[in-house]
């Protein structure tokens, strides 16, 4: 980037836009196109792999023959590695360049995914998942950096739209894809799927991303100690939060140890930063109104995704439905993605404020949750088709608008003027993305469990011995199962179990209604945060116009 942006605080938005238009290529060529395709595939691949792992966790545990408690660490091994490598990618990317990191990481990731289904040893499986997380975790922070520096401004809205659609679509298409693999091929394909896609990404990166300039031999090598403290601390906190519900939170010594150790390492990273600042990290650059608010909105958006990740699958799963039966309900969220992406990109290019696009998306998601709050235990996947279409449009608009605001914030805050600024910017949002997704899922699981206990207790108050309604139901059910019971006593016990299962089913249904209402109110809160965002000085249409008229201005000056 031209050095003229370095003092961006003294420049007007017009000067920043002109310098940005000068530094970014005005014409798209084969190399940037392949590079952009590669990083978009990489961003979607990370999300798809994590989602497929969570869906196929039961099959993976059965394959290894591990217990429930040991199997719970498999998902944490992959996701904690993602969290660890996110901040550390700032150091690696600044030291070696994105091309080297992505090619090496994608190659190791491909080999790891190819051999993962063939591993039968629990310890080796955990180690392989950690390697897969460490390698795939480099994809997301480096993608935004490359796209911002190489895509012509008139194509930037469509790139953002496709980028958001790939990430969002991977979440919603995973249940149907995994169900199809499981029914027609094998559960092994939840890893082999990624092993086939990653080489395509490598080809695009190899031909599309230029090599980073050689580092000066006499230049001092930045210290990695602060990055190590920060990454390890975040990974420990992430693991503690993800395992907190299973370990019973502060009543568990393991949870307490992970939480305190993670907090201590974060404190060490802060002290290290204050005593000896690292040239590759620009934490003060993040302290801006819109950057902080956009981080909060990304966290909030990840929580609203629990509607399609947790609420809808579990509301159908209580009937014993398999992944291929649940998938059709969720895949309707992914059906309109390409059309919505093209429409959103066109609107952004026509000077639509991305805040309005994001607000429209959150509004659609909130209305869809209100419609889903009419759920009953008689619902099947078909009952969700219409609301999931609305949810798909809402998620796409909200995420595209959010990423659009993030990119504009990165440009007009001067992020492109220094590599360490944009790397820090990308790593910050990568960390928020992971923490938001996990914290939202953990909180929703805890919320549903607590609400189910409450509703079970309240419903149970109306089922008492001596009540003529209860006695009548017990007698009718006992008579119905008597023919297949060993006697009157056994029939009565089975009747009592049936009434108990009915109560639990209704309690779960009521807890899901509470969950839908919670997500709807979360969308309202997101709309309030969106209203607090400051308008960007210029929009994508203005940036496009700057780049189109740049040659004429340069000729006039000459």
Regions found by a protein language model. Name each.
Residues 1-48, 62:
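Cytosolic juxtamembrane N-terminal segment immediately preceding the first transmembrane helix
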Residues 18, 412-416, 428-558:
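Hydrophobic transmembrane architecture of multi-pass small-molecule transporters
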Residues 30-81, 85, 276-408:
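Transmembrane core module of solute transporters
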Residues 42, 102-108, 112, 128, ...:
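Residue-level signature of the transmembrane alpha-helical cores
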Residues 60-61, 92-93, 177-185, 316-317, ...:
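Interfacial helix-cap and linker-helix signal at transmembrane-aqueous boundaries
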Residues 86-226:
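Helix-loop-helix hairpins in multi-pass membrane proteins, especially solute transporters
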Residues 138-151, 397-414:
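Intracellular juxtamembrane helix-capping segments at the cytosolic ends
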Residues 179-297:
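Hydrophobic transmembrane-helix bundles of small-molecule transporters
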């Amino acid at each position: 980037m031209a050095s003229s942006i370095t003092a961006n605080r003294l420049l007007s938005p017009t000067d920043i836009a002109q310098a940005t238009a000068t530094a970014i290529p005005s014409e798209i060529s084969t190399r940037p196109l392949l590079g952009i395709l590669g990083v978009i595939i990489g961003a979607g691949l990370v999300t798809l792999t994590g989602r497929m792992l969570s869906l196929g966790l039961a099959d993976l545990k059965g394959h290894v023959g591990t217990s429930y408690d040991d199997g719970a660490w498999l998902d944490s091994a992959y996701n904690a590695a993602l969290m660890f490598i996110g901040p550390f990618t700032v150091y690696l990317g600044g030291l070696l360049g994105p091309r080297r990191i992505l090619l090496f990481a994608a190659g190791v990731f491909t080999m790891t995914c190819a051999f993962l289904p063939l591993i039968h040893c629990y310890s080796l499986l955990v180690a392989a998942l950690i390697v897969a997380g460490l390698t795939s975790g480099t994809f997301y922070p480096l993608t935004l950096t490359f796209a911002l520096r190489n895509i012509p401004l008139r194509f930037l809205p469509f790139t953002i739209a496709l980028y958001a659609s790939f990430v969002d679509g991977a979440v919603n298409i995973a249940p149907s894809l995994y169900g199809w693999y499981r029914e027609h091929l094998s559960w092994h394909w939840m890893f082999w799927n990624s092993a086939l896609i990653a080489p395509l990404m490598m080809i695009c990166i190899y031909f599309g991303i230029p090599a980073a300039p050689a580092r000066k031999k006499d230049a001092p090598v930045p210290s990695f100690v602060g990055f190590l403290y920060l990454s390890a601390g975040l990974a420990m906190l992430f693991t503690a939060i993800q395992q907190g519900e299973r370990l019973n939170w502060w009543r568990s010594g393991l949870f307490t140890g992970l939480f305190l150790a993670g907090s201590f390492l974060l404190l060490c990273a802060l002290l290290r930063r204050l005593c000896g600042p690292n040239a590759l990290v620009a934490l003060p650059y993040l302290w801006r109104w819109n950057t902080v608010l956009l981080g909060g909105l990304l966290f909030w958006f990840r929580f609203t995704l629990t509607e399609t990740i947790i609420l809808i699958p579990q509301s159908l799963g209580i009937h014993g439905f398999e992944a291929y039966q649940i998938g059709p309900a969720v895949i309707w969220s992914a059906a309109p993605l390409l059309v919505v992406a093209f429409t959103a990109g066109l609107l952004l290019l026509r000077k639509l404020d991305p805040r309005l696009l994001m607000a429209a998306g959150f509004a659609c998601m909130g209305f869809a949750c209100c419609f889903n709050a009419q759920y009953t235990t008689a619902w099947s996947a078909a009952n969700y088709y219409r609301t999931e279409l609305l949810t798909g449009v809402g998620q796409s608009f909200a995420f595209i608008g959010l990423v659009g605001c993030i990119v504009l914030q990165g440009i007009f805050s001067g992020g492109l003027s220094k590599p360490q600024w944009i790397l820090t910017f990308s790593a910050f949002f990568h960390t928020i993305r992971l923490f938001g997704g996990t914290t939202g899922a953990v909180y929703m699981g805890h919320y549903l469990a607590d609400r189910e206990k409450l509703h079970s207790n309240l419903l149970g108050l109306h089922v008492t011995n001596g009540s003529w309604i209860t006695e009548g139901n017990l007698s009718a059910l006992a008579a119905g199962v008597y023919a297949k019971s060993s006697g009157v006593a056994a029939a009565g016990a089975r009747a009592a179990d049936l009434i108990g299962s009915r109560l639990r089913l209704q309690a779960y249904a009521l807890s899901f209604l509470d969950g839908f209402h919670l997500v709807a109110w979360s969308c309202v809160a997101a709309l309030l945060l969106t209203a607090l965002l400051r308008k960007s000085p210029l929009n994508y249409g203005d940036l496009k116009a700057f780049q189109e008229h740049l040659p004429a201005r340069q000729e006039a000056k000459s």
